[in-house]
Amino acid sequence: ECVVITAAVKVWRTYSSSSYFSWSLVTRGHQTLLTRMASGLAGQRYDLVVFGATGYTGQFVVEEVARTAQQERSQGKVPLSWAIAGRSEKKLQDVLTTAKKETGLSLEDVGLVLADVSDQKSLNEMAAKSNVVINCVGPYQLYGEPVVQACVENGANHVDISGETLFMESMQLKYNKAAEKAGVHIVNACGYDSIPADLGIRHMIRNFKGELNSVEMFVQTSGGSSKSAIHTGTMESAALVIANRSKVGAIRRELFPTPLPKPKYKVAKKGFLYKNDTLGYWGVSFPSDEPVVYRTQRYRHEMLGERPIQFQQFIRMPSLLHGAMLIIGMAYFFLLSSFAWTRNLLFKYPDILTAGLFKKAGAERESLKNLKFTVTQIGHGWSEKLAEGSDEYASPPDSSIIVKVKGPDPGYGATSIMMVSAAMTILREKSLCAEKGGVMTPGIAFANTGIIERMCERGMSFTVEQEQQKN
């Protein structure tokens, strides 16, 4: 060990004057490991830090960062400096061991950062070492704000995979101005909630020669099995969304004091169970992405003068009967989540109360390999643009277009691709991201970037299934 330590000191002396790296020693048992860290003395930061790396989703995100870093190297790009962060050094080392096994890549250069969501000082230190924090610690309603605060106060960008409306809109209300001033992008909903919805619409706009009025979206998964259980972290986040639903209104009224203009050709809200005759799909109303899309459309109307697109979201079902059964299941989950005592029981016995749909251990890896998702969006609009976004058309929409977004298992594989792609887009295309900073949605932040192409390189697809045509 003395020989190793002496060698390490010599290496540190050699590279400590570098503007890029310093070195530190991390001891694991009797083995002293030389681990590359971002230089605190020289003020350098890691490009990416995965916070919550020891969690179920965090493990998948670490593996996706490793593959992305390898891809960047193979393309001759600037090497990625990155680290993983959590409370336990041993567990962080275990994460790297698993990631090395799953990816077949050497991860000796990945840094370790100790940080605890209950210790603001440690979060500040982590953020000060980061260019972009990839925050995997949820539920965000419980644990998200201290991380956002640390990033804003210490000049780090931030991405998360929150689908929790109260958290996202509260963060925009509290930290948007400070984030703008600090020049950092705080981007929520960078996973299955809500990148396919928000950026699917963006892809549709790029390919629609005219102006869109409305979009309907149907989500579908396939290839699952009884072993494809959902991790309880997702369940807890969903339950907290339901529990806190009454608080959203007050936040939104303060955040958006004036309503959007009423559309001349308003699309009627569909019922819980609805069939789209054009697509031939049955759908169950499931508006999880609607608040995110609303914020994007509001921004584009207020800041860019665009016409807000009306948006409705559904889970695609194979039949009317399947749809009715899903509605019953959703009503059951809604009731369990609405009261504190039933919610506590749900959190304590998720496997029993959800018939194995949610498990604390999450899904078995093998069961995720055949799992895929498809998002189908059908847009309706006008074939010609008016001079101003505030002008009104004399006749109803006359054209339609269909876009599909596809990817691997939505909960972990695709979510990791989307989250890491969002972080890499901020890292590599910061100047193309919206504004100089702020708390925003993916559809705002990444509208003018190459994030869609980046995600397609990593295994997803955004395609125009049906070119624009007259109704």
Annotate the PLM regions.
Residues G138-F256, S288, V292-R295:
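Glycine-/Pro-rich loop/turn segments that contact NAD(P) or position catalytic residues
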Residues V78-L105:
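Glycine-rich phosphate-binding loop and adjoining beta1-alpha1-beta2 segment
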Residues V113-K129, P139:
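Conserved Rossmann-fold cofactor-binding substructure of NAD(P)-dependent oxidoreductases
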